[in-house]
Amino acid sequence: MSKTIISPSILSADFANLERDIKLVENAGADWLHVDVMDGHFVPNITIGVPVVASIKKVSSIPLDVHLMIENPEKYIEAFAKAGADILTFHYEAVNDVQAIIDLIKSYGVKA
């Protein structure tokens, strides 16, 4: 039987105390940290981008599960990979060629 993975979202964090909240979920036993990236186009909300992911990577000791809820995710995969994403997920309806995007993600050494 496979292990259940706990990946709490940072959207419920206090962004004024983001590092503290990240440490709280890590200390509580979270396996991954889920980061929802929203662009205001693919979904109506806007959240965080590459600089915040890079900052989170500096203070987090667990893998970053970056969820791209954006249009044209292929344009941003390299930047999020370089910012420290360990896992990148995207919405199949946001791309024309799902396998090409998976291959692109993996080409940066990131899980898809």
Name each model-derived stretch:
Residues 1-89, 93-100, 104-110:
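Conserved N-terminal beta1-alpha1 strand-loop-helix module at the mouth
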